[in-house]
Amino acid sequence: MAVKDKVVIITGGAMGIGRYNARRFASAGAKLAIVDIAPMEAVASEVAELGAQVLPVHTDIRDEDQVRAAMEQVHKHYGRIDVLINDAAIVTHFMAGSPRWPVIRDMESSFFENVIRTNLMGTFHCTKHAIPYMEEQHAGHIINFGQGNVRNERDPDSIGACVYHISKVSIRAFTKEVAAEEREHNICIVSMGPGGGDAQPNDGRRGIATDETPAENRERMRWVGDVVKDRYILAAEAPMELSGNQITARDGKLVKLDD
């Protein structure tokens, strides 16, 4: 695969979809930097066992100074930054059988602010401080976790997920704007979610189960490997004509989604 020997930064790589992606990119021969506030020993060990180089960098992406230092550390260690995957986020488990987040009338301002600071501002910080290195190379790929629209108001699973969806739709708009700014520097910036690609069986299962999903919830969810597959590896090789778009992968090919 074209990501072999590429330097790939995965924020939020200690767990969830980020951890799955770390293993997939390691298997494809990439050089990994895992940026997370959570302990990274487990994923670093998994990546090393796959024969890949890995650099864990403890970082709170809400803190711009920490992010700036993290990008400097990765560049100093590897000499370049080829791919940034902005995976780190506070995720609502509204489809995992966990307690719902509060609806707006019951939500503390501090809760709302923390989700926006992590999901949206964290993506901004990481993108901002990776771009100068990519501009220097005149090449790079940035993959943001965003979505092009909000959930159907009739979907009961969307209740309590308001601020999460606000953050992800905002990331979609952010992607379009930054992609336009960086096109002349040959930096491809796309937005995509873990699902929305290959058709899934209509068996009543909702959400995506990862290594950290409680066993009692896994039967009602789809396993991350069956849903995500290699879509982020494909996105890390996306052509410039897709930059700025919401994309997914179907039948092993990247597809532009309608806004």
Task: Give the label of every model feature segment.
Residues 3-33:
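Canonical Rossmann dinucleotide-binding motif of NAD(H)/NADP(H)-dependent dehydrogenases/reductases
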Residues 58-71, 109:
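The beta1-alpha1 cofactor-binding region of Rossmann-like NAD(H)/NADP(H)-dependent oxidoreductases
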